[in-house]
Amino acid sequence: MPITLDQQYVISVGDTDVVSINYTDYLNSGELLTGTPTVAEVTTAALTLSNKIINTSTYTEADTGDTVAVGKAVQFAVTTSTAGAYRVRVTCGTDATLARTKVVDVLLEFK
């Protein structure tokens, strides 16, 4: 089973929000994410997941204040009309000489 991130997102039902998964701590020095990330709901099919990308500009994490460099995070939009807790699996390859695939789960709670 993949690592489940400590950070849990709380989103209002009906909102469309952007979720950003920072892989910086999982990547080696100089290693970047590459390819098209896979973002899939694990437990149900109630979420609409769209715009799945590797970040193309730096951003600052709201909860930590950390600046995330280009190519170090996967971002996607999510919405639902059903309250509940959801598990989403995020998978992305890297550009390492011996390419790796990084997989994490993130918990989303819609209220």
Q: Where would I find each of the regions flagged by the language model?
A:
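Surface-exposed, short loops/turns at beta-strand junctions within beta-sandwich domains
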Residues: T79-A85
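Aromatic sugar-binding surface patches on proteins
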Residues: T64-Q75
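Extracellular and select intracellular beta-sandwich modules with Ser/Thr-enriched
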Residues: L98-V104
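Predominantly extracytoplasmic/ectodomain segments of secreted and cell-surface proteins
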Residues: M1-E31
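Short beta-strand edge segments in extracellular beta-sheet folds
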Residues: D105-K111
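Beta-strand-rich extracellular modules
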Residues: T91-D95
